Structure formats: structure tokens, C-alpha cells
Amino acid sequence: MINFKKQIMKKTTFFLCKLLLISSIVIFPRSSFAYPFWAQQNYESPREATGKIVCANCHLAQMPTIAEVPQSVGADSVFKAVVKIPYKDDIKEIGADGSAVPLQVGAVVMLPDGFKLAPQERWTDEIKEETEGVYFTNYSEEKDNIILVGPLPGDTNKEIVFPVLSPNPATNKEYHYGKYSLHIGGNRGRGQVYPTGEKSNNVIFTSSSAGTINSIETIEDGSYQINIENENGDIVTEAVPVGPKLIVKEQDQISAGDPLTNDPNVGGFGQLDAEVVLQSPYRIIGLIAFFIGVGLTQILLVLKKKQVEKVQAAEGV
């Protein structure tokens, strides 16, 4: 009965979290696009067969992501996987409305099967302090080994601590001691492409046609319409949303593919793999016994050498 209640509470919490995310997207659709929720909705797994994490499909720019995980952990123990998302201080990007806004960050950690987010009652005071204000969510109910975070304010979350609970092969024979791989991704800033395939305003806009810029119209919301007259005398109109800065002017001669705007993007996505060893306690005991044996052997050799030296001294050798 208790387990049934726990399952009901877990499913209810998961449903409410999804409802909250959907509500935020309905109210603020453009500001929410290309964050982890969209990967959850569009991909069964956040990692493609090629090894690429799907966040890179919308966040086209590459920037480094750093991860720190312990070399080895014990069974049924809590450890920290730290994801670092570095970028220069005081950098701002353009928001969906064209205004300058602080960067936000997000991260995904794909743990091996059996590893999962540690329950809060097992968090140390240090972990509680380091994760204050950070909300963790599982990629899906079935994939509790994949943990998502974000978007979060980047200025205070350039390092995100994931409290991880390791499995115990002694109580669950599905898991084994040995080396495991983690797949980690970290992002700062908005994406360049929406999941629908259309560009955001956080990308370079280029000309689809060669010709002469006939006119540039400024729309009331701050966006532009660039009218290009091609060699046939036809007018091709390029729409540029509010945000990127124009680098062309009327009467400029341009070729197909030439940039019409600067590159406003200051963020980027990065991914990496890490390894952790689930250490068997018997192996540790064996290793300790080995070192003790080596130490005793060295002591006995020293004692034997001294004994031989005494005998040789007594015999006058």
C-alpha cells in the first residue's frame, strides 16, 4: 500500500512539472524554445546513434563544457558530478524581443543504467548548499538515469552540481562492478534554430539571392524587410527579425549567401564523455591486503638482511 501511494505521488509530481513547463511555453513561447523540454518532446533519447547530444541541433555554436566526476565510487553511495559551463562575465545576448538579456545555462547528464539522481534525504549539507535554487528533472519517467537542468541564470550557475546515487550490485544483480561511461552536455545562451526548423533571431541572416539591394524597410517592431532586385528584375524580399544588426545598405551589390546581418550569438553548446568506476568493496579489501603483504615482505627482507649481516660480522667475513 505504501509503495502504491509513492508511485501515485511520483506520477502526480511528474505530471504537474510537465504541466508547468507547458504553461510557461504557452505564455512565453519564444523565450522557452530550444530548452531541454523540447528535446524531451521530440526525441526518445537525448543522444543520437552518432553520439551527438540533440541539443546541438538547435544550439549550433560550439563552446567548451567541462565535467568533474570521481575516478571511482562505492556501491550505493552519493557522489557529485559537476558540470562547468564557462563564459566571459557580463556578456549579454539578444532576447526574443531584441533586447539585451543575461545568458541562461542548462545541462544534461546521461548516467549509466542504475545510476540516478540521489534522493534529497541523502544529500549532505554541502550538496544542499551547492544545489540551492537548482531544479532537477528526469528526461522521462522511464529514464531516471538522464537528468536535466535549466534554464538557469548563468551568472550564478556556471557550475552545476548533480548529486548522483550509484547502484548496489549486491542487492540488484542487473548491475555489475566495473567501468561506466557518462555523457554530458552544457549550454549557455539561446539557440539559433527552433525545433520547427525556422531560425531564431540569434543567428546570422544571409541573402537567398544575388542582386542589388533596392530598398530596406524598417517595420514598426524594429525588424527589417530587405528588397533585393535580381538580374531578372524580380524583387526578392528578405525578412530580418528584431535583434541582429544590418551590415548592408541600399544599392549594395550582394551574392547569394552573403551575410545581411552580424552574428549576434555569444553562447554555445558543448558535450563530452566521462568515466567512473563502480568499485567492489572486495577489490578494495584485496588491494589493501596486497599492500599489507608487500609491506610485510619488505620488512621481512630488511630483517633477513640485518640477520645475515650480523652472522657475517660474527664470522669476520
From Swiss-Prot:
Cellular component GO terms, alphabetical? plasma membrane-derived thylakoid membrane
Details of cofactor binding: Binds 1 heme group covalently.
Family indicated by similarity: Belongs to the cytochrome f family.
Query: Where is it localised?
Result: Cellular thylakoid membrane
Spell out the protein name for this chain: Cytochrome f
Q: Which cofactors go with this protein?
A: heme
Looking up Pfam families in the UniProt record yields: Apocytochr_F_C, Apocytochr_F_N
Tell me what organism the protein belongs to.
Answer: Prochlorococcus marinus subsp. pastoris (strain CCMP1986 / NIES-2087 / MED4)
The taxonomic lineage of its organism, from the top, reads: Bacteria, Bacillati, Cyanobacteriota, Cyanophyceae, Synechococcales
What GO molecular function terms would the record report? electron transfer activity; heme binding; iron ion binding
